[in-house]
């Protein structure tokens, strides 16, 4: 039986109800956000391999609060003495996040070893009683690698976070790993290293706190 006028009943088949019609703009907005895609950092309790589409885990703590204190950008060399040349630290609340977008797999593409750059904590961050080391990995293929952080040559896992590799415009991948310390922990060791293993090859970058003062 079809409900009569004034009765609470079902909508006619094939006709969207008023509530659904009102929700269409929200549904379309949600679809646009999902299609665009955002990198979600994953907390790493141990060194592990990550690839495109790897599960993000239960951690939803954003790196915006950790790395939004200053923005990495190319320019004059104004960071600590041990910073890679061509980069500077700019104090900014804007977050530096790699965009992911739609991923395209190219099966016939040759392997490419990642270019690795290790950044020590900035002076602004140390003054705020925080210390974050950043390991940037660019131009690698395929998009699966393993990152291991070391303090004086000993692997460490506490305070490590990793982003999921994202496709670059050249069809290679980029990713970043973060090691969060206190200024006291940063100064108490002779060296910190970021070791990246990719397709049987290993790239390791090391920074010495004593050279950054």
Curated annotation (Swiss-Prot):
Region of interest (C region), ranges: 109-213
One Pfam family linked to the record: C1-set
Signal peptide stretch: 1-37
Transmembrane segments: none
Subcellular location: Endoplasmic reticulum; Secreted
Oligomer and partners: Associates non-covalently with VPREB1. Interacts with SYNV1/HRD1 (via N-terminus); this interaction leads to increased IGLL1 ubiquitination and degradation in pre-B cells, possibly through a lysosomal, not proteasomal, pathway.
Gene Ontology biological process terms, A to Z: immune response; immunoglobulin mediated immune response
UniProt keyword list: Disease variant, Disulfide bond, Endoplasmic reticulum, Immunoglobulin domain, Secreted, Signal
GO CC annotations, alphabetized: endoplasmic reticulum; extracellular region; IgG immunoglobulin complex; membrane
Broad class of where this protein is predominantly found: endoplasmic reticulum
Gene Ontology molecular function terms on file: antigen binding
Record protein name field: Immunoglobulin lambda-like polypeptide 1
Gene: IGLL1
InterPro entries the record matches: Ig-like_dom, Ig-like_dom_sf, Ig-like_fold, Ig/MHC_CS, Ig_C1-set, MHC/Immunoglobulin
Tissue specificity field: Expressed only in pre-B-cells and a special B-cell line (which is surface Ig negative).
